[in-house]
């Protein structure tokens, strides 16, 4: 598949630094020079912020011909939404209620994802989201990319959603390739030897009919700890010289 990517409401500190009115607290905000998960995200109760999201998505589809737009959905803290009068008003107006193991703020995320999906579907595009978009009321036409193991992908396929398997248990190539790391360049952690990559079965746990929803698998090489091209080439080198089965990684 081909996709363009956008985090529509989290990791937005750069946006909030420029447009503090789009945040729940009003700022001031600073651009973060590092990586991580931060509490300040877009205010979903602010209609101008939601229009900003749609404007960005509109620009993306003008630039990229991709059928799919990956809009994120992972690692979005709820703390600001929980304490934000505008977000709480949106929750009340939309009838978003806690239940089924999910909070009203979880369903506020679902509202945002569904709104983005409607915007893109109306323009002939489809969304992909990380498996956290299952936490609430998943957008009805969304393709789910499962990174927290395979459980989210299995659940999504059982629900009738298309799935891309990218489990960190098998497909995160920024992990160390060996348990003996003393001579290895810095990595984020973990241990993912080639043998573990080969063990990936993207359709395990699914019926033949459910397995049809698995579009394939994706390996990720995140670069928080990878500063040079040489390091990029080193990290997956043990994998990329192998011919992996086409039913495992695509």
Language model features: what each stretch is:
Residues 3-12, 28-35, 67-81, 127-131:
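Core alpha/beta catalytic barrel or barrel-like domain that forms the active/cofactor pocket
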Residues 12-48, 80-104:
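Aromatic- and acidic-residue-enriched carbohydrate-binding clefts of CAZyme catalytic domains
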Residues 46-68, 75, 89, 93-238, ...:
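Substrate-binding groove of N-acetylhexosamine-processing glycoside hydrolases
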Residues 1-5, 9, 241, 246-250:
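Single conserved hydrophobic/aromatic residue that forms the stacking wall/gate
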């Amino acid at each position: 598949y081909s996709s363009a990517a956008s985090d529509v409401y989290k990791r937005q500190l750069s946006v909030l630094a420029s447009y503090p009115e789009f945040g729940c607290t009003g700022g001031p905000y600073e651009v973060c020079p590092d990586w991580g998960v931060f509490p300040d995200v877009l205010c979903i109760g602010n209609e101008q912020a939601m229009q900003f999201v749609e404007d960005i998505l509109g620009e993306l589809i003008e630039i990229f011909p991709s059928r799919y737009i990956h809009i994120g959905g992972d690692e979005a803290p709820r703390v600001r939404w929980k304490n934000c009068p505008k977000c709480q008003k949106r929750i009340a107006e939309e009838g978003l209620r806690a239940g089924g193991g999910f909070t009203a703020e979880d369903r506020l995320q679902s509202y945002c994802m569904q709104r983005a999906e409607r915007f893109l579907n109306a323009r002939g595009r489809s969304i992909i989201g990380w498996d956290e978009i299952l936490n609430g009321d998943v957008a009805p036409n969304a393709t789910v990319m499962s990174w927290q193991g395979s459980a989210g992908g299995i659940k999504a396929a059982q629900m009738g959603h298309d799935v891309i398997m990218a489990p960190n248990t098998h497909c995160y190539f920024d992990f160390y390739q060996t348990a003996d790391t003393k001579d290895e360049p810095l990595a984020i952690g973990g241990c993912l030897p080639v043998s573990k990559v080969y063990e990936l079965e993207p359709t395990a746990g699914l019926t033949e009919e459910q397995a049809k929803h698995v579009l394939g698998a994706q390996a990720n090489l995140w670069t928080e700890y990878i500063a040079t091209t040489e390091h990029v080439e080193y990290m997956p080198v043990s994998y990329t010289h192998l011919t992996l089965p086409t039913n495992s990684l695509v």
